[in-house]
């Protein structure tokens, strides 16, 4: 797998939900190498460790990185301005193995939702299930619809979409798909893996927790 450290030009860095930012960075050499399910390491000035951010999309030499402000490092990221050079190690990880002819169920929970957008664009008629704690944290719904996905929104508190968890919807619709790909918090992934085991469906998972 080829990856490298390069300076990306920051094109935009906008808040799209409460504490969630949409960063677009350009590098014609590395951006096209990204596969769905892969991630990046973003260098944050004054911080020793890079921040792992999943690839939300890659198109025309532009990487889209959607991230949540959780600490000082990502707060500094959120303050970066258009035109700055961003030091990024990319692309990293194995990504999802997508096979032609299969229908996939793509499940994202919280900040595990963004990598599912690029994955949806690489699949045919995917079923996408997104889960959020409440309506204030909902992101990327129009993007998934524009990608041609069958979309189901869930919220833990019922403030938008289906009241409940992504696994509730998965159990109802799992026989409509051939395989499941999921990204999100560990408890959610464990529950999804258990459902897939019960229904004898292949499952690929990607951890969204910070390394």
Annotate each predicted stretch with a short phrase.
Residues 2-84:
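Ferredoxin-reductase
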